[in-house]
């Protein structure tokens, strides 16, 4: 999570975070800051999916071009979020992929896909969510999770739905 000057939020001492929530994550990264903001919204009484949406809205006020893609799970829900600040893969990412001989895959950098899972009777029983790294063909049931959308799945029933942030 970085601002327009490329300064990571971890180095931005002026960004107002709840130190208690941040320290409870055990981390010192931008992901720990993101998670601590989510924890604050949960403490305010929001359900996990809405806490994630609120956290992205808040963080985007300072860092609108950052990517907030994540997967987070509670006892009741799995939330998988696609929230990239840029639609196009940055030249630096393409450069890095090229260095490893994988330049043709750079277009897939921020893409998230999901596939519904059914039980033996054909009833919905869950969802698989994945990022890049292996083939996820539409012919195999994979669907693109659009930018600024999240999958919200019940850990108890496997039922899921897509919602916007």
Segments (PLM) and residue ranges:
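N-terminal segments that mediate ammonia production and transfer
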Residues: 2-165
């Amino acid at each position: 999570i970085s601002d327009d000057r490329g300064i990571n939020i971890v180095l931005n001492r002026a960004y107002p975070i709840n130190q208690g929530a941040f320290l409870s994550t055990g981390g010192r990264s931008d992901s720990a800051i993101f998670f601590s903001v989510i924890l604050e919204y949960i403490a305010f009484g929001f359900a996990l999916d809405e806490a994630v949406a609120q956290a992205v809205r808040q963080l985007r006020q300072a860092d609108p071009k950052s990517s907030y893609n994540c997967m987070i799970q509670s006892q009741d829900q799995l939330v998988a979020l696609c929230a990239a600040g840029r639609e196009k893969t940055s030249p630096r990412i393409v450069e890095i992929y090229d260095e490893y001989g994988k330049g043709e895959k750079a277009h897939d950098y921020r893409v998230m896909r999901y596939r519904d899972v059914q039980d033996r009777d054909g009833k919905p029983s869950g969802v698989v969510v994945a990022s890049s790294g292996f083939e996820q063909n539409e012919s195999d049931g994979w669907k693109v999770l659009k930018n600024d959308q999240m999958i919200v799945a019940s850990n108890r029933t496997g039922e899921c739905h897509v919602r916007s942030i």
